[in-house]
């Protein structure tokens, strides 16, 4: 009997792991450590389950799981002023966390931690860019009088995403042995 599954097909195991990643991220996001006044928050590692899923299954599947998470996050506490802003602040940036799986083939081949760090860095920068764009286009009125909207959005979004990234890195380093030795064997 021939296996008709392609590399892009979803198995039951992938779907279950994707649902678990979404659920864990959702729960972690509810334990907000700090909430910014105009949106954005610092959490105890809400991106980690999405990153781990992306490492296991690649950027495309990671993007989809992240986007679904973003939609749920938007539905349960999102702040929406325009449909484009909703996309820029919810499904797109969390979908872009899936870019942490860009180097999943290298990670699987080498079991090195470097692809994890490279992918996570690219993912957080991509997420940051979408939030900055949203800030410039839709939240520029919050900038102090006389301040450039782009500069305001860059600083505002960096103030919480840099901390989110640092927390993610600390957790990834704490999980380094598990990630490089056991993650692929599950």
What are these regions (language model features)?
Residues 28-42, 68-103, 139-141:
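Interfacial aromatic-anchored transmembrane helix boundaries in multi-pass membrane proteins
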Residues 1-22, 150-186:
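Alpha-helical transmembrane segments and their cytosolic interface
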């Amino acid at each position: 009997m021939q296996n008709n599954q392609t590399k892009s097909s979803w198995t039951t195991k992938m779907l279950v792991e994707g649902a678990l990643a979404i659920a864990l991220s959702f729960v972690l996001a509810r334990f907000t450590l700090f909430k910014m006044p105009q949106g954005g928050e610092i959490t105890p590692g809400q991106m980690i389950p999405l990153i781990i899923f992306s490492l296991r299954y690649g950027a495309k599947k990671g993007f989809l799981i992240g986007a679904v998470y973003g939609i749920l996050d938007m539905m349960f506490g999102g702040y929406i002023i325009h449909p484009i802003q909703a996309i820029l602040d919810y499904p797109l940036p969390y979908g872009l966390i899936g870019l942490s799986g860009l180097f999943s083939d290298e990670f699987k081949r080498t079991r090195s931690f470097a692809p994890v760090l490279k992918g996570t860095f690219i993912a957080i920068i991509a997420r940051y860019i979408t939030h900055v764009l949203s800030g410039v286009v839709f939240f520029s009125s919050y900038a102090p009088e006389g301040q450039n909207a782009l500069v305001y959005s860059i600083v505002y979004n960096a103030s919480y995403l840099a901390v989110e990234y640092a927390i993610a890195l600390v957790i990834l380093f704490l999980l380094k042995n598990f990630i490089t030795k056991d993650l692929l064997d599950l």
